[in-house]
């Protein structure tokens, strides 16, 4: 079996709807291939959730057909955050969980990602086994062994109660005014209820999904509307989730953005204050230098993993630590959950706000963010601009200018045809100029 993935990226199979591999016929076969592999594992039961994209209906049906042909039973949750599917997979003792979502991407993209029976990303060997099955022709099991489908009617209520259980029982959100932006995505019927039931006054936005407006000028990838609303409503803070509820960005009462690095810092510092910190914090190559320095001042260990929440998870398991994050808003808290969970992460920050009697603004000021500029350059074809001599020369020049007061990172996106150029340092003007210089070199060599 080849150890090179053809379809699975860093976060499952993803692409534009109607274009291979996000087509009904491929997804049907993917369901069958996954079913063939999972049927060998045990229960033959799979939990399937989705976000609010209009294409979710089509892909859900295709998956169901493929799984049934392989003899697996599918239980559908309807629109449900990705971490909720991970949780329900565990609690129902299912063989796997499947999420139909393209996370923070626009509505015209979609994807399929899998969770193991433990609520974690599938192991590499299972993904490779599924890919191997995709090369075969579909063979139905005998009619008497075909899988059935059912719907889980209380999925939302179960997950709401789970989220609330991660908030300290002695604390309440009473007296807090929150603006909650659900990105017109999978948290729209979950998150506002979680915070309300814990006592907060909630102003909800991004809670009117129509299949086409997921992540559209709302949510964790675009917090401008949230920033404006928090200030207008004189709210204590705002929380923004992405389309599938595994990313969170927060906004303080002044309208300042609080990203994944700052959120992880606040959670780690609060755990240290309570004497409950287990180990250190895992970030990524994109994590701001300010977070690393802020944690160092507190005596909290910090290491970087490759970009992608699966690599953060791998490093956490390797180190035996509990807190990991990406600045984009993936926050993994292994003492609470098995994967990135935006609502649960938000609740831990709120617990810090209430428990310390400090504002989010005050808590976030504990670390100083270095200016960081990210440029995305789209490319096509099989050429790798990162190998071009002109690009390497531009990087060398910038690194020499920044010296020890900054850093450069170039990488290919794991989910889109993009080269990501990141420059970080103390001098904001120099950082901006440097990022544009490298991005132009990449464009010229695409």
UniProtKB/Swiss-Prot annotation:
<dbReference type="GO" id="GO:0000287">
    <property type="term" value="F:magnesium ion binding"/>
</dbReference>
<keyword id="KW-0597">Phosphoprotein</keyword>
<dbReference type="InterPro" id="IPR005843">
    <property type="entry name" value="A-D-PHexomutase_C"/>
</dbReference>
<feature type="binding site">
    <location>
        <position position="246"/>
    </location>
    <ligand>
        <name>Mg(2+)</name>
    </ligand>
</feature>
<keyword id="KW-0460">Magnesium</keyword>
<feature type="modified residue" description="Phosphoserine">
    <location>
        <position position="103"/>
    </location>
</feature>
<dbReference type="InterPro" id="IPR005846">
    <property type="entry name" value="A-D-PHexomutase_a/b/a-III"/>
</dbReference>
<dbReference type="GO" id="GO:0005829">
    <property type="term" value="C:cytosol"/>
</dbReference>
<feature type="binding site">
    <location>
        <position position="244"/>
    </location>
    <ligand>
        <name>Mg(2+)</name>
    </ligand>
</feature>
<dbReference type="InterPro" id="IPR050060">
    <property type="entry name" value="Phosphoglucosamine_mutase"/>
</dbReference>
<dbReference type="InterPro" id="IPR006352">
    <property type="entry name" value="GlmM_bact"/>
</dbReference>
<dbReference type="InterPro" id="IPR005844">
    <property type="entry name" value="A-D-PHexomutase_a/b/a-I"/>
</dbReference>
<dbReference type="InterPro" id="IPR005841">
    <property type="entry name" value="Alpha-D-phosphohexomutase_SF"/>
</dbReference>
<dbReference type="Pfam" id="PF02878">
    <property type="entry name" value="PGM_PMM_I"/>
</dbReference>
<feature type="binding site">
    <location>
        <position position="242"/>
    </location>
    <ligand>
        <name>Mg(2+)</name>
    </ligand>
</feature>
<dbReference type="Pfam" id="PF02879">
    <property type="entry name" value="PGM_PMM_II"/>
</dbReference>
<dbReference type="InterPro" id="IPR005845">
    <property type="entry name" value="A-D-PHexomutase_a/b/a-II"/>
</dbReference>
<feature type="active site" description="Phosphoserine intermediate">
    <location>
        <position position="103"/>
    </location>
</feature>
<comment type="function">
    <text>Catalyzes the conversion of glucosamine-6-phosphate to glucosamine-1-phosphate.</text>
</comment>
<protein>
    <recommendedName>
        <fullName>Phosphoglucosamine mutase</fullName>
        <ecNumber>5.4.2.10</ecNumber>
    </recommendedName>
</protein>
<dbReference type="InterPro" id="IPR016066">
    <property type="entry name" value="A-D-PHexomutase_CS"/>
</dbReference>
<dbReference type="Pfam" id="PF02880">
    <property type="entry name" value="PGM_PMM_III"/>
</dbReference>
<comment type="similarity">
    <text>Belongs to the phosphohexose mutase family.</text>
</comment>
<dbReference type="GO" id="GO:0005975">
    <property type="term" value="P:carbohydrate metabolic process"/>
</dbReference>
<dbReference type="GO" id="GO:0008966">
    <property type="term" value="F:phosphoglucosamine mutase activity"/>
</dbReference>
<dbReference type="GO" id="GO:0004615">
    <property type="term" value="F:phosphomannomutase activity"/>
</dbReference>
<dbReference type="GO" id="GO:0009252">
    <property type="term" value="P:peptidoglycan biosynthetic process"/>
</dbReference>
<keyword id="KW-0413">Isomerase</keyword>
<dbReference type="InterPro" id="IPR016055">
    <property type="entry name" value="A-D-PHexomutase_a/b/a-I/II/III"/>
</dbReference>
<dbReference type="InterPro" id="IPR036900">
    <property type="entry name" value="A-D-PHexomutase_C_sf"/>
</dbReference>
<dbReference type="GO" id="GO:0006048">
    <property type="term" value="P:UDP-N-acetylglucosamine biosynthetic process"/>
</dbReference>
<feature type="binding site" description="via phosphate group">
    <location>
        <position position="103"/>
    </location>
    <ligand>
        <name>Mg(2+)</name>
    </ligand>
</feature>
<dbReference type="Pfam" id="PF00408">
    <property type="entry name" value="PGM_PMM_IV"/>
</dbReference>
<keyword id="KW-0479">Metal-binding</keyword>
